[in-house]
């Protein structure tokens, strides 16, 4: 009888310990962009690493129609992590465009905690139009597909056009039809972009089969105006597009994407997350080339990402701790570190 009671007590104790251990695991439903997107693919790779190395957390990847849906989802309590870009943070802070009127619905403030890669946007025209469309301002009055309405790439290019005073006519088209519409004259231009200055989107590759498009670079004066307006500018090699783009360089405007969590994840845990990512970045890059930029210089990339958004959203204290340790922190950002 005593042995039976002892066995039951031991079994109960084990069950209680198991239940206690289970309760210590914090669920992180992490919003990202749609299945098949670079953001969805990258988060799957990242979540696998973090779930293995940080067992107190359980990350589940939650695809959404677009990255801004994940930002809004975090702010309203639907997600604990999100896929956020500097252009989205700009719109949120300024109560404009896709975030117009959204602040009234917010339950918590998004913060920046990890920057992962850039996306670089620009413009393309048909090669036959190179003689008459020579810079971005020449697109005024023209029919332009700058991307699907909710997408960050569209928002960034539209913002750049606005800074230059480009009064184009936006055309919403199916991605699969963009090339044929450009070829047939249904549109005069469409957006082109790269990811981490290394690859392009499948739909742009498909459009290349239907239309002989040429990269349309902003003029030197336009580049100067864009820089003055706060845009970063980069030159990408044409061979990224794996076709003749009829220019010897492609001038694009990068913006920064990150996988972010809020203050619900403590400073020390975000710091550990960042150090784990840095330690395992070679394996991450092998699984997804989108991590190549942080493989080259993770601390420097965090500095650039923070600089892109420091005026729009606060900085997670765990990211600040990591950056201070790596010597890439700017003391003028001290007041922008998030506090509960």
Give the label of every model feature segment.
Residues 1-9:
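Bacterial N-terminal signal peptides that target proteins for export
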Residues 8-17:
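Bacterial N-terminal signal peptides
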Residues 17-23:
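Sec/Tat signal peptide C-region and signal peptidase I cleavage site
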Residues 25-53, 57-60, 121-184, 195, ...:
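Bilobed "Venus flytrap"/periplasmic-binding protein-like clamshell domains
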Residues 42-76, 245-247, 340:
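Extracytoplasmic small-molecule ligand-binding "clamshell" domains
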Residues 86-87, 95-105, 112, 127-129, ...:
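Pocket-lining segment of extracytoplasmic ligand-binding domains
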Residues 134-135, 141-159, 230-299:
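Ligand-binding clefts/hinges and TM-proximal coupling segments of bilobed small-molecule sensing domains
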Residues 177, 194-215, 225-227, 268-340:
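An extracytoplasmic/periplasmic, membrane-proximal ligand-sensing/linker region
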């Amino acid at each position: 009888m005593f042995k039976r009671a002892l066995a039951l007590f031991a079994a109960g104790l084990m069950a209680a310990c198991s239940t206690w251990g289970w309760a210590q695991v914090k669920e992180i439903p992490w919003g990202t962009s749609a299945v098949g997107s670079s953001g969805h693919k990258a988060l799957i790779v990242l979540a696998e690493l973090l779930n293995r190395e940080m067992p107190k957390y359980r990350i589940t990847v939650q695809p959404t129609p677009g990255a801004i849906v994940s930002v809004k989802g975090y702010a309203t309590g639907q997600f604990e992590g999100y896929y956020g870009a500097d252009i989205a943070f700009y719109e949120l802070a300024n109560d404009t465009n896709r975030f117009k009127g959204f602040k009234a619905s917010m339950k918590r403030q998004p913060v920046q905690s990890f920057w992962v890669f850039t996306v670089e946007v620009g413009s393309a025209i048909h090669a036959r139009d190179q003689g008459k469309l020579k810079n971005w301002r020449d697109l005024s009055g023209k029919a332009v597909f700058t991307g699907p309405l909710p997408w960050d790439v569209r928002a960034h290019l539209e913002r750049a056009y606005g800074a230059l005073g480009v009064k184009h006519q936006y055309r919403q088209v199916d991605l699969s039809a963009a090339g044929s519409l450009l070829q047939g004259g249904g549109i005069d231009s469409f957006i082109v972009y790269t990811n981490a200055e290394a690859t392009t989107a499948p739909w742009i590759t498909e459009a290349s089969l239907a239309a002989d498009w040429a990269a349309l670079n902003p003029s030197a004066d336009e580049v100067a105006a864009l820089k003055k307006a706060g845009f970063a500018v980069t030159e990408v090699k044409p061979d990224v597009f794996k076709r003749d783009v009829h220019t010897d360089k492609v001038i694009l405007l990068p913006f920064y994407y990150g996988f972010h969590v809020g203050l619900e994840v403590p400073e020390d845990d975000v710091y550990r997350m960042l150090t784990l990512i840095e330690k395992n970045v070679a394996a991450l890059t092998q699984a997804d080339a989108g991590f190549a930029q942080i493989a080259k210089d993770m601390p420097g990339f965090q500095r650039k990402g923070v600089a892109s958004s420091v005026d729009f959203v606060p900085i997670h204290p765990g990211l600040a701790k990591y950056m201070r340790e790596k010597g890439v922190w700017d003391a003028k950002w001290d007041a922008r570190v998030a506090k509960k």
